[in-house]
Amino acid sequence: MADLSSLKDLGTASEAAAPAHVRKVDSLGRSYATGKRKNAVARVWVKPGSGKIIVNGKEFADYFARPVLQMILRQPIVAAARDGQFDIVATVAGGGLSGQAGAVRHGLSKALTYFEPGLRSVLKKGGFLTRDSRVVERKKYGKAKARRSFQFSKR
């Protein structure tokens, strides 16, 4: 390692050490990422195309029937202003529909940044690249649920 003699040298050394975000694409021209939310895990592939979104072999509007879930899934594409430019294929397992939609959104955001590193700042600012670590709190013994106590009778 180079000898750092002043603070100016330290600044240039840290700039050189910062990893540049490079494009990660497989032999078929796709970017791959995994997304997680609650107990759901999604594997997402992104490639240039007409804007088709397939989730577990179905059209995303058929798989996620509720409009709120469809909106959650499309948020990264809309935020990046890339609507209709990518074909997205996702397989998702575990959890319920809300967790699965969040997992696909997380994986899609990561895959978009791998395909187009310039989108990273926009998606990071929107909070799409951050893993939502909130999970259900476990039930404790001596309690009805995680925190709710059994009904108490004074007399």
Curated annotation (Swiss-Prot):
Instruction: Read off the PROSITE patterns from this record.
Output: RIBOSOMAL_S9 (PS00360)
Molecular functions per Gene Ontology: RNA binding; structural constituent of ribosome
- Alphabetical keyword list: Ribonucleoprotein, Ribosomal protein
InterPro entries recorded: Ribosomal_Su5_D2-typ_SF (IPR020568), Ribosomal_uS9 (IPR000754), Ribosomal_uS9_bac/plastid (IPR023035), Ribosomal_uS9_CS (IPR020574), Ribsml_uS5_D2-typ_fold_subgr (IPR014721)
The biological process GO terms on file are: translation
Q: Name one Pfam family in it.
A: Ribosomal_S9
Any Gene Ontology CC annotation: cytosolic small ribosomal subunit
PANTHER family xref list: RIBOSOMAL PROTEIN S9, SMALL RIBOSOMAL SUBUNIT PROTEIN US9M
Record-stated family: Belongs to the universal ribosomal protein uS9 family.
Specify the protein name: Small ribosomal subunit protein uS9
Species this protein is from:
Rhizobium etli (strain CIAT 652)
